[in-house]
From Swiss-Prot:
Residues 41-54 are annotated as: G1 motif. GO terms for biological process: adenylate cyclase-modulating G protein-coupled receptor signaling pathway. Residues 38-384 form the G-alpha domain. Belongs to the G-alpha family. Mg(2+) binds at S53, T194. Residues 186-194 are annotated as: G2 motif. Residues 215-224 are annotated as: G3 motif. One of its GO terms (molecular function) is GTPase activity. This is Guanine nucleotide-binding protein alpha-1 subunit. Residues 284-291 are annotated as: G4 motif. It comes from Solanum tuberosum. The lineage of its organism: Eukaryota, Viridiplantae, Streptophyta, Embryophyta, Tracheophyta. GO terms for cellular component: cytoplasm; heterotrimeric G-protein complex. G proteins are composed of 3 units; alpha, beta and gamma. The alpha chain contains the guanine nucleotide binding site. Residues 354-359 are annotated as: G5 motif.
Length: 384
């Protein structure tokens, strides 16, 4: 009898402990659910090479702890790969231009650089790249300085030459140092294609401050074959941040060289706007790469792009840059309102001029985004 009572007491204690654990788990789930309700979900979208991932890295630097030494070191093979890929594009481009252009001679490499070019092109085509050494840097510098490569660089918009080509070539010696650790700037310039989905949680004014919203930002692959992975992220989004590289109006897609990048961006922007799940979602349009745009637009006519064929130049210098920018901005505004029902006054739409590599500008822009979204939340709560 005593043993039965003892056993019942044991079972009772076990049940109590299990009930306590269950209650604790339920309490935690409830807390996490409540906490999640206060986290604003932001979706970072845009075509490939729009600068989305650079914006994402800036957020990590600005509003989180940045990159620790281990993370920085992980970028060494990425940066070395970028160097090899860049010099390969330029070398192969010069060969192609030398075969097909009327002024073929200016794209012909000097005799001493032909062999170097073939060697570097072979390295750039590998799946695994060697670490940069002083000898390889010497070869890359010799090829980079060849007049044929510099002429080819002027045709970079036709050849998928990355925007950061100059930066890589100016820092070769530092990249090849045996003790090299990438700087924050190196990481921002490093190019690695986003595949799948990456996320980060942050607050533009610090998570512990009552006045600040907490955001969860999702960056997704921009190439066409990556876009199907966006679908499951569409529900419950507070805002879409859409990046458009306005400097790429004369360039073609990496994955389809028949397609103009700006036309692809326009079509993607309009497709996203028409998605039913974004009916009430705020849109923040980042007209990105303005630093490149302001240099290019004075040399390459904006009406090179089919979408901008009605553009007419009115001035020179700064006035022309501003006129061209306002024209592009208006085109995106027209697209937005054409794709948005007239009664959708509850959907916020803002346009920001951005340069993803400019940390101060990115910080200022996200403060403005934060302010806009907080005002919208207060309005929806009836407090404004």
């Amino acid at each position: 009898m005593g043993s039965l009572c003892s056993r019942n007491k044991h079972y009772s204690q076990a049940d109590d402990e299990e009930n306590t654990q269950t209650a604790e788990i339920e309490r935690r789930i409830e807390q996490e659910t409540k906490a999640d309700k206060h986290i604003q979900k932001l979706l970072l979208l845009g075509a490939g090479d729009s600068g989305k991932s650079t914006i994402f890295k800036q957020i990590k630097l600005l509003f989180q702890t940045g990159f620790d030494e281990a993370e920085l070191k992980n970028y060494i093979p990425v940066i070395h790969a970028n160097v090899y890929q860049t010099i390969k594009i330029l070398h192969d481009g010069s060969k192609e231009l030398a075969q097909n252009e009327l002024e073929a001679s200016k794209y012909l490499l000097s005799a001493e650089n032909k062999e170097i070019g073939e060697k570097l092109s072979e390295i750039g085509g590998r799946l695994d790249y060697p670490r940069l050494t002083k000898d390889l840097v010497q070869d890359i510098e010799a090829l980079w300085k060849d007049p044929a490569i510099q002429e080819t660089l002027l045709r970079g918009n036709e050849l998928q030459v990355p925007d950061c080509a100059h930066y890589f070539m100016e820092n070769l010696e530092r990249f090849s140092d045996i003790h090299y650790i990438p700087t924050k700037e190196d990481v921002l310039f490093a190019r690695i294609r986003t595949t799948g989905v990456v996320e980060i949680q942050f607050s533009p004014v610090g998570e512990n401050k009552k006045s600040g919203e907490v955001y969860r930002l999702f960056d997704v692959g921009g190439q066409r074959n990556e876009r199907r992975k966006w679908i499951h992220l569409f529900e419950g989004v507070t805002a879409v941040i859409f990046c458009a590289a306005i400097s790429e109006y004369d360039q073609t897609l990496f994955e389809d060289e028949r397609k103009n990048r700006m036309m692809e961006t326009k079509e993607l922007f309009e497709w996203v706007l028409k998605q039913p799940c974004f009916e009430k979602t705020s849109f923040m349009l980042f007209l990105n790469k303005f630093d490149i745009f302001e240099q290019k637009v004075l040399k390459v006519p904006l009406n090179t792009c089919e979408w901008f064929k009605d553009y007419q130049s009115v001035s020179t210098g700064k006035q022309e840059i501003e006129h061209a920018y306002e024209f592009v901005k208006k085109k995106f505004e027209e697209s937005y309102f054409q794709c948005t029902a007239p009664d959708r006054v509850d959907r916020v739409f803002k346009i920001y001029r951005t340069t993803a590599l400019d940390q101060k500008l990115v910080k200022k822009t996200f403060k403005l985004v934060d302010e806009t979204l907080r005002r919208r939340n207060l309005f929806e709560a009836g407090l404004l």
